[in-house]
Every structure is written in C-alpha cells, then in structure tokens.
From Swiss-Prot:
Pfam family, one: Toluene_X
Keyword Transmembrane in annotation: yes
Subcellular location: Cell outer membrane
UniProt topology in membrane: Multi-pass membrane protein
Coiled coil: none
Protein name per UniProt: Long-chain fatty acid transport protein
Entry keyword annotation includes Transport: yes
Keyword list, A-Z: Cell outer membrane, Lipid transport, Membrane, Signal, Transmembrane, Transmembrane beta strand, Transport
C-alpha cells in the first residue's frame, strides 16, 4: 500500500465520520436520525411530522408543531460483513464480522414562537464508517483499522407563509474524527518476491533487501494516521400542504468542507523509501503531518405524505446525492508538497423509499417500509475498508403514546447487501454484508 492509498483511506474516514459505525446507507452516508423513521425505512421524512426528529431532515416542518417538543434516542447497528479470498502468497484472506456493532444516538428539540415562526435544534450524524481486521491479517496493508466518527450540530428556523407554504433554513456544524491503522500482513513476502523476480534480485544488494522485506512481521504497523476537524454547511426545506391530509416537501443539504489534518507515522525502516517499493512511506516510527480537504456531497430529497384514510397513510421519498462531486483526493505535506493525487470517480446515487402507517387508536401507531440504496462507488474503486454495495431495506416499527404528551418509538430494519468482488492492490476479495438495526426514542411535548 502506498502513502497515496493510506491518505485515500484517511480521507474517506473523515468523510465517513458523520457517524461512529459502519455506514449503512450507500457510500458512507447515514440515515439513522430517528427510530420512527427507522421503522418506515426513512420514507417520507421531509413531509411527515410525527416527532421532532423529522425537523433534522426538513426544517420547514417546524411549523407543524404547536408545542415545544423533545425527542431523544439511539439506533443500535449490528452488521455482519464478511470478506474472503486468497493472497498471491497463498495465505487466506478470510475475515468475518469486519464491521463492529455501534450505538448511534440522536437528540432533537422543536419550539414554536408564534403561528408563523419557530426554531429547532438537533444532534445527529449523516456519514460514518468503521471496519476492523486482525493485526496479523494477510491483507493488513489494505485492511487494518478504519475508525471514523462524526457529530452534526444543527440549528434551524422556519416561517409559515400561509396555510399551504412553509420554509425552513438550518446551519450545520460537523465535527469529524478519524483513526487509520494499516499492518504489514504478507506485504513483506510479496515485496520480497517482486524484488527477486526483478533484475535487482540478481545482485547482493537486492537479495539483502528482499531478505529484509521478507522478515517484516505481519503485525508491523506500516501506517498510522489520526486527526480531527470541524466543517460547516447549511440545509433548507420547503413544505407544501395541499390540505391537512396531503403534504409534499423538497429538502436540500449542502456540501460540508472538512480540512482534515492528520499525524502520519510508519514503523518501517526508512531504507525502503529509496527503492520505489509498493509500500507506505517509511518514517522509522517518527511522526509527520499530512493535510487533506474533503467535500462531503450535497443531497436533494423529495418526499410525500398522504393520509388516504382516517387510519392509513402512505409516505415516500426519492433522495439524490451528488457523489460525482467526489472525484479526487489530494493530500499535501506541511511544506505543500503533494503526497498523492488520486482520481476517485464516484457517480451520483439515489435512494428510494416507500412506507405506510396504520393509526390503530389514540395509543398505538404501526408503520412499515422498504427502501433501495444505490451505491455510488464504481466497482473498480471498492476497497475492503469501505466494502460498499447496493442495499435493500425491510423495516417495521411502532409508537406507543402514554398520553397526549409522552410517547415512545421502536423501530427495526433489516438490510441486505449484494455480494461484490473487490480488487485492491495485489489482492482479490469477495465481500458480502447484511445488518440488523434496532432503534428506540422517547418523545415529550411540553
């Protein structure tokens, strides 16, 4: 793995940082901002106003609340992502459960000011990723640990123009933190083989270098990078109410620019830097700085909610994320030298969701939904630290209202990903993944 590849992974770590777990939407985007939404596969989120969590998706929904309302909870993600393959060295590349479980918290508050104005605040996350491989894993030079966390702080306001139109605007502050570690695995053996097959392998110097490379332990830390940074953006929404039973929404979330600063080190001997070998830049354990600017892509979403019967409603969404804005990653040193410049070539991607809600009585509400997440990652750019794939959702949930003020939401989703092939460095992998998500939120209206 080259230093270029290392910083590629670290950049994705920052991008993915908007939540502290394996990303369970396409790319490294996340949706898990409420448990009621989880139960309907996040369908119609820009137009539904059944709890304060919806306001983080569409600030215009603030005008639908006539009392200060609070919601807090978490979604537990239990992924099952497995990797298989065989290294050119003959060692197995099999690794099970590479994505750890995690809790994803959320908190929301909405307060009307009068009949026309209101404000809201939330703590959520919109991107995230985590993968972990054993320190002695054969493909450790491209696996290792990728631990990415973020937190999104949102403050928003809304204005009701008339009975039909409402508008909302929000400000987002995103805190991102990343830790990347890569280990030698069998890379030393592969490098030694390359040297011995080249003309250098016929020289005493080349043979000595090959012997040194072959002696690198599998758990040698060949790359380490960590860092944190703030980024800022905005979001907006429009809500159109045809009548009290039918409403439609258009929402927008801007790019977030994160100027990531990381500390890079490698335990490899600096002698390897003199031979142009396919390994990270060696620092002999010393630390140096690297800088990378990453733009998290903008997102558009159209949503609808139709209460077709006193007890039944349908809701739906189509989200479009401009992943084509993510075309390259470029890292520089403190002196401004380019450490790498890599073409990523992501494509724009969409998410489509459909759900229904059954209002059983004043206490019980039931919901369900399905969704499809289109992956923005081209097949040739997949990696085992971000084994992205198209995903299909099946979701169900319920709300129990204790009284007119307090209620609790419970949601569950099953996500199934396609089996994909990954070519990364000298390795060829196959990856398959699925996940269960469980969420609960408590809601209170003052």
């Amino acid at each position: 793995m080259s230093q270029k590849t290392l910083f590629t992974k670290s950049a994705l770590a920052v991008a993915v940082a908007l939540i502290s777990t394996q990303a369970w939407s396409a790319g490294f985007q996340l949706n898990e901002f409420s448990s009621s939404g989880l139960g309907r596969a996040y369908s119609g989120e820009g137009a539904i106003a059944d709890d304060a969590g919806n306001v983080s998706r569409n600030p215009a929904l603030i005008t639908m609340f006539d009392r200060p309302t609070f919601s807090a909870g978490a979604v537990y993600i239990d992924p099952d992502v497995n990797i298989s393959g065989t290294s050119p060295s003959g060692r197995s590349l099999k690794a099970d459960n590479i994505a750890p479980t995690a809790w994803v918290p959320n908190m929301h508050f909405v307060a009307p000011i009068n009949d026309q104005f209101g404000w809201g605040a939330s703590i959520t996350s919109n991107y995230g990723l985590a993968t972990e491989f054993n320190d002695t894993y054969a493909g450790g030079s491209v696996g290792g640990t990728t631990d990415l966390e973020t937190m999104n702080l949102n403050l928003s306001g809304a204005y009701r123009l008339n009975n039909a139109w409402s508008f909302g605007l929000g400000f987002n502050a995103v805190y991102a933190r990343a830790k990347i570690e890569r280990f030698a695995g069998d890379l030393g053996q592969l490098v030694a083989g390359q040297i011995m097959q080249s003309p250098a392998g016929k020289t005493p110097q080349g043979q000595a270098l090959a012997a040194t490379a072959n002696g690198i332990d599998s758990n040698t830390k060949i790359a380490h990078l960590n860092g944190n940074q703030w980024g800022f953006g905005w979001n907006a929404g429009i809500l159109y109410e045809l009548d009290k039973n039918n409403r439609y929404a258009l929402t927008y979330r801007s790019e977030v620019k994160i100027d990531f600063k990381g500390n890079y080190s490698s335990d490899l001997n600096r002698v390897f830097n003199n031979y142009g070998l396919p390994i990270p830049t060696a620092t002999g354990g010393a630390t140096q700085s690297g800088y990378l600017t990453l733009n998290l892509p903008e997102m558009w979403e159209v949503s609808g909610y139709n209460r077709v019967d006193p007890q039944w409603a349908i809701h739906y969404s189509l989200a479009y994320t401009s992943w084509s804005q993510f075309q390259q990653l470029k890292a520089t040193s403190t002196s401004g030298d380019t450490l790498f410049q890599k073409h990523e070539g992501f494509k724009d991607a969409y998410r489509i969701a459909l759900g229904t809600t059954y209002y059983y009585d004043d206490n019980w509400t039931f919901r369900t939904g399905i969704a499809f997440d289109d992956s923005p990652v081209p097949a040739q750019n997949r990696s085992i630290s971000i084994p992205d794939q198209d995903r299909f959702w099946l979701s169900a949930g319920t709300t129990y209202a204790f009284n007119k003020d307090a209620s609790v939401d419970v949601g569950v989703s099953y996500m199934h990903g396609q089996s994909v092939k990954i070519n990364e460095g000298p390795y060829q992998f196959e990856s398959e993944g699925k996940a269960w998500l469980f969420g609960t939120n408590f809601n209170y209206a003052f």
